[in-house]
From Swiss-Prot:
Residues 173-183, 237-251 have a biased composition (Polar residues). This is Mothers against decapentaplegic homolog 5. InterPro entries: Dwarfin (IPR013790), MAD_homology1_Dwarfin-type (IPR003619), MAD_homology_MH1 (IPR013019), SMAD-like_dom_sf (IPR017855), SMAD_dom_Dwarfin-type (IPR001132), SMAD_FHA_dom_sf (IPR008984), SMAD_MH1_sf (IPR036578). May form trimers with the co-SMAD SMAD4.
Length: 464
């Protein structure tokens, strides 16, 4: 009791009152400092304290915006930790497990939401709602499979390898993304495996039949396979079919009784991450159970399950370039899985470079484009809903069109050093330090759909 009384001995009555609505029992001292800093700001505004207390005491009732001045970088420092103000106070008074601003959306009644970039920002926790994962509609697969459903079709193609003939183009966030918001500057290909993207105004940039650079190593059993590449002549016939963006989830002219719905299921581990140095895999795969994962260059003696610490991994083939690059990874990248979307936030002092076909599709980029994310920036790199739409449409175009989507479920990311047309490194396997993120939910969904569809028209064989 003595320690508790000393904790609040110098706490103002206003702070004590506000702490009465605090959620969770962790980080008492941090919460007290956060509330104390807020009270000092609100006392300068007439009625602000009363408005906040009313909002906290009557959660279901309408309440006013409670604002504080926006700082230069938008963040607020509380006890040596910087964070976004609306996230800090939503964590204190509503959701102690809140990880990121990506998990919050403002209500329509809020006049000063954080995202509006006004001089004032609302920190009323009841002016924000938490993003919920959307329910993905089942994919309807025609009932004409002759394949034994006890076997996974993805396993059959695990040892396939292929080369990407096109050197990846490069883009920088946010500059390149603003340029492409209205459409694509890349030439259109009749062989595009996907329908027009939301950002490309009815056109999709040039998309070769082959995938991004594949890693020149044998993939172990727990790693998703490289994508299957159909024969060139078949892509010339079947791959050139265009897809309508508004097509039904069910195959056209297909009676409902002749389709098998395949539901999306959230896996226990939403992704796995594998680390590479040049073309060598280093260490074991990291399986992410938390929706917030840090991949950094440090060592972690506490063995935190939410961190993948690359500093712990050893490699006898490591050269001086790799050693130097590893020293600059620093805080690395923060991966969030929120509301069916994956975000990558660069915490490192140097940029990270991301190759995500789903992200490229959304922005109207070439599928293999490598996007540079500068320090302090975050980018959405995968959207489950867009993937679900593509999968539902691809089912109507055969096995190969669906299998093409496996390339979308693997995201490559390099630290410090980039690759592509604007860099002297043309392939990700030429970068000193990089990771491969495999999205388990979409991959498992694809596996189930492919199993229902049966074998491809041209059976795949290792014999040429």
């Amino acid at each position: 009791m003595t320690s508790m009384s000393s904790l609040f001995s110098f706490t103002s009555p206003a702070v004590k009152r506000l702490l009465g609505w605090k959620q969770g029992d962790e980080e008492e001292k941090w919460a007290e400092k956060a509330v104390d800093a807020l009270v000092k700001k609100l006392k300068k505004k007439k009625g602000a304290m009363e408005d906040l207390e009313k909002a906290l005491s009557s959660p279901g009732q309408p309440s006013k915006c409670v604002t504080i001045p926006r700082s230069l970088d938008g963040r607020l420092q509380v006890s040596h930790r910087k964070g976004l103000p609306h996230v800090i106070y939503c964590r204190v008074w509503r959701w102690p497990d809140l990880q990121s601003h990506h998990e919050l959306k403002p209500l329509e009644v809020c006049e000063y939401p954080f995202g509006s970039k006004q001089k004032e920002v609302c920190i009323n926790p009841y002016h924000y709602k938490r993003v919920e994962s959307p329910v993905l509609p089942p994919v309807l697969v025609p009932r004409h499979s002759e394949f034994n459903p006890q076997h996974s079709l993805l396993v059959q193609f695990r040892n396939l390898s292929h080369n990407e003939p096109h050197m990846p183009l490069n883009a920088t966030f946010p500059e390149s993304f603003q340029q492409h918001s209205g459409g694509s500057s890349f030439p259109i290909s009749p062989n595009s495996p996907y329908p027009p993207s939301p950002a490309s105004s009815g056109t999709y940039p040039n998309s070769p039949a082959s995938s991004g650079p594949s890693s020149p190593f044998q993939l172990p059993a727990d790693t998703p396979p490289p994508a299957y590449m159909p024969p060139d002549e078949q892509m010339g016939q079947d791959g050139s079919q265009s897809m309508e963006t508004g097509s039904s989830l069910a195959p056209q002219n297909m009676p409902r009784g002749d389709v098998q719905p395949v539901e999306y299921q959230e896996p226990s581990h939403w992704c796995s991450i594998v680390y590479y140095e040049l073309n060598n895999r280093v260490g074991e795969a990291y399986h992410a159970s938390s929706t917030s994962v840090l991949v950094d260059g440090f060592t972690d003696p506490s063995n935190n399950k939410n961190r993948f610490c690359l500093g712990l991994l050893s490699n006898v083939n490591r050269n001086s370039t790799i050693e130097n690059t590893r020293r600059h990874i620093g805080k690395g990248v923060h991966l969030y899985y929120v509301g069916g979307e994956v975000y990558a936030e660069c915490l490192s002092d140097t940029s990270i470079f991301v190759q995500s076909r789903n992200c490229n599709y959304h922005h109207g980029f070439h599928p293999t484009t490598v996007c540079k994310i500068p320090s302090g920036c975050s980018l959405k790199i995968f959207n489950n809903q867009e993937f679900a739409q593509l999968l539902a449409q691809s089912v109507n175009h055969g096995f190969e069109a669906v299998y093409e989507l496996t390339k979308m479920c693997t995201i490559r990311m390099s630290f410090v050093k980039g690759w592509g047309a604007e860099y002297h490194r043309q392939d990700v396997t030429s970068t000193p330090c990089w990771i491969e993120v495999h999205l388990h939910g979409p991959l498992q969904w694809l596996d189930k759909v492919l199993t229902q569809m049966g074998s491809p028209l041209n059976p795949i064989s290792s014999v040429s």
